[in-house]
Regions:
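Short, well-ordered beta-strand segments in beta-rich or mixed alpha/beta enzyme
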Residues: 2-9, 39-66
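Residue-level signal for secondary-structure boundary sites
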Residues: 16, 60-62, 96
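Generic structural motif
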Residues: 11-13, 59, 93
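Short, surface-exposed ligand-recognition loops at beta-strand->loop->(often short) alpha-helix junctions
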Residues: 9-21
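An amphipathic, aromatic/His-enriched active-site/gating alpha helix that lines ligand/cofactor pockets
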Residues: 24-36, 55-89
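Acidic-enriched, low-complexity/disordered segments with a strong bias for Aspartate over Glutamate
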Residues: 13-16, 46, 57, 72
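Glycine-rich beta-strand-turn "strand-cap" elements at beta-sheet edges
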Residues: 2, 39-48, 76-97
Length: 97
């Protein structure tokens, strides 16, 4: 399993509307094949920055979502709030303890 980590910079004074749009659009991500859950958190220091965290089977599962109609609907619901393009990276399994 991998973790998608996306920093989302939202335009000034658009946080409440963005949060409502994300809540409504979550089923689009969570119904995607290979998705094991998603959450969005707001940054404490700068409330215009949000962190999207999604658990995927693989990077390929995330890429398949990005090529799907579900993603187009997610994008239509959320991307117009962004002040800058999202910064998306993927993280591997946790290090052994």
């Amino acid at each position: 399993m991998i973790i998608e980590h996306a920093l989302l910079r939202v335009g000034e004074d658009r946080g409440d509307a963005f949060a409502a749009a994300v809540r409504a659009a979550f089923p689009l991500i969570e119904s995607a094949p290979g998705c094991h859950g998603a959450e969005v958190r707001v940054q404490h220091e700068d409330p215009s920055i949000y962190l999207l965290i999604v658990q995927w089977d693989s990077v390929q599962a995330h890429q398949a979502f990005r090529a799907s109609a579900l993603y187009e609907r997610w994008r239509a619901a959320t991307h117009h709030f962004y002040a800058a393009p999202p910064e998306v990276t993927h993280f591997l399994a946790p290090l052994a303890r």
